[in-house]
A protein has these predicted regions:
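Alpha-helical transmembrane segments of multi-pass membrane proteins
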Residues: 1-219
Length: 219
């Protein structure tokens, strides 16, 4: 999960810096910008923000419909197939139109968020950091008021803190890559996705082969 949110951080920097100032990891920012455009009667700008929002909604829609059919056809879990799809989109040629990157990255970010929902029983978001920051605050409050000897919440604090750090590291790397590589910076996200895909595929074919029928929620 750290690797997934690291890759999402790279894509977040890429779409904001090189794809017209849009946010791919979550849609709150895009909806705010849409509202501003509508309020200022900037109709063309409003339409510009409708596109990534619609792509994000479509990603969630698709990720709810097709996992069962796909995993039975290929005999590996939907999570593994999704990461393979993310690699394909991440490896698009640098000459690909910006609009295609906008739609595709928002689309796969939505599917990733909707698919990878928890890690070892801890609810997780693998495309943005807001929930992890909130959970850190909750965890620190529990630490302040914890009962003597009860440290069960500390594991959760560590997981969320790790996710925030990896997301931040991804955005930093993404920003640096955008400066030096330009449109080719998106390829940097392929490596962490490839690592995750290799681990997932190996698990599907060996130690977690019997987990095929489990609902998508992450490995």
């Amino acid at each position: 999960y750290d690797t997934l949110i690291f890759a999402a951080g790279i894509l977040g920097s890429y779409t904001y810096m090189l794809c017209g100032g849009i946010f791919c990891n979550a849609q709150t920012g895009n909806i705010v910008l849409l509202g501003i455009a509508l309020g200022t009667r900037s109709w063309t700008s409003a339409l510009y923000y409708v596109i990534p929002i619609s792509a994000y909604a479509l990603g969630a829609f698709i990720s709810e419909l097709i996992p069962d059919d796909v995993k039975h056809r290929f005999h590996i879990r939907w999570e593994t197939i999704l990461v393979a799809v993310e690699i394909v989109f991440g490896a698009l040629p640098a000459s690909t139109p910006v609009q295609v990157f906008q739609v595709s990255i928002n689309f796969i970010a939505s599917m990733q968020y909707n698919t990878f929902r928890n890690s070892e029983g801890v609810p997780m978001a693998t495309t943005f950091a807001t929930n992890h920051v909130r959970q850190l605050g909750i965890g620190l409050a529990k630490e302040l008021h914890r009962r003597h000897g009860d440290t069960s919440h500390r594991r959760v604090i560590k997981r969320h803190f790790s996710m925030v750090l990896f997301f931040l590291a991804g955005t930093i790397l993404g920003a640096v890559a955008c400066i030096f590589l330009g449109r080719r910076a998106v390829w940097v996200a392929v490596l962490p996705y490839a690592i995750v895909f290799a681990a997932f595929l190996h698990a599907d074919l060996t130690s977690e082969k019997e987990w095929l029928e489990r609902d998508p929620a992450g490995h």
